[in-house]
Amino acid sequence: MAEAPTMTIEYFAERNPGTRTLPRSVATRAGGFVFVGGQVARDEDGTIINGAIEAHTRQTLKNVSHVLALAGCTLDDVVKTTVWLEDARDFDEFNRVYAEFFPGNKPSRSTLQAKNVVGTKIEIEAIAYKA
């Protein structure tokens, strides 16, 4: 009987000093899929940035892009995002910045309102695919 094919799973470690001690990986590759754990508006030092939703969205998507690069992907490879906004009234401003990062084909997206636990206005998860 032939052996069932196995899927390679690769974990990408947390590098941000502000969250390095959390028990998580920033991304996991399973086959051709890359799952990016929730990213927020932290700068390179791990500090939540100041500013309105536009600044938080821009920093968060830069962080998503950086994590994707660890796995050899770009925002062009993203097929799905999940977004948590702390304030639903920020939806229009968020969308304007989001559209800058996804100018062509847009990934599927779910957007919810939720109280974020780390003091940021937004959190984004992403799923990418690269064969």
Question: Where would I find each of the regions flagged by the language model?
Answer:
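N-terminal presequence-like segments and the immediate start of the first folded domain
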Residues: 1-62, 66-76, 85-131
